[in-house]
Amino acid sequence: KGKKVTWADPYGNVHDLDYVLERNGTNDVTGTPVAFIEMAWRRYTKHSRNKAQEIQGAILPLAEKYQWSNPFLGAILAGVFTDGSLEQLRSLGFHVLYFHYETIVAAFASESIDVAFDESTPDTVFRKCVQQIEKAPVSAMQGVKDHLGNANKANIDKFVASLKERLDRMVEKVIVIPLYGRSNEFATIDDALRFLDGHSVYEGCGDFRKYEVFISFTNGDRVEGSFKDKTKVREFLQFVAKQ
């Protein structure tokens, strides 16, 4: 209860996270992350966007560090979050599972526990509610859990399905493109366009520059890499194969 896992981003910053699913990890050895999932509760909309930014600030640098494994990014949110804060996370690649405040209140009310509160709620009322929850029998809390799960079943199923797709994904296609030719630099867009108009394309022209590698998966994910030698290409492909 209350435990966190700590991961370091490529800039040397450490982040305490809620859930990380990894392959080949142990209590002593860090594995390869396949999912980062953060959880948060907010009662008021004025705090929701800040929390969304806090989540992305912790997770996106880690996603960058482990881009070869292309981990699942998840956020499980409860309470009151604005549509803008939710879309902000989704636009950055997060899968969001959101439990509306009203469904939480209704779930506890199903077991005769009133958890509704706002800024005007007296501390005495709040403490009484907390004590009621702490003393509630296991059967009552199971009832709350069941009610909340049923009320949000469609969203839960969608989130779990997306996570399962990531964990079960298979390589669908691998593209390796050897690039040749000299570099051409231009001061303006018009100069670049004139170059393209007069450029003749044929395979193997010029010196070898690098390999571009693109891998697509059955769940729609995609990873790519750019390498100057075959050894690095091989390492990249073997790493992905182990995922």
What are these regions (language model features)?
Residues S91-Q243:
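Non-catalytic C-terminal interaction segments of nucleic acid-processing enzymes
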Residues T30-A35, M39-Y98:
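Catalytic cores of nucleic-acid endonucleases
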Residues G12-E22, K46-K51, V115-V125:
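Phosphate-binding glycine-rich loops and adjacent basic patches that engage nucleotide phosphates
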Residues E22-N24, L62, G198-Y202:
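Intrinsically disordered, low-complexity boundary segments flanking structured domains
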Residues K1-T30:
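Active-site metal-binding core of divalent-cation-utilizing nuclease and nuclease-like domains
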Residues Y19, V34, L179-R182:
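Hydrophobic beta-strand positions in blades of beta-propellers and related beta-sheet-rich domains
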Residues R23-E38, L73-L77, Y101-E119:
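Hydrophobic transmembrane alpha-helix bundles
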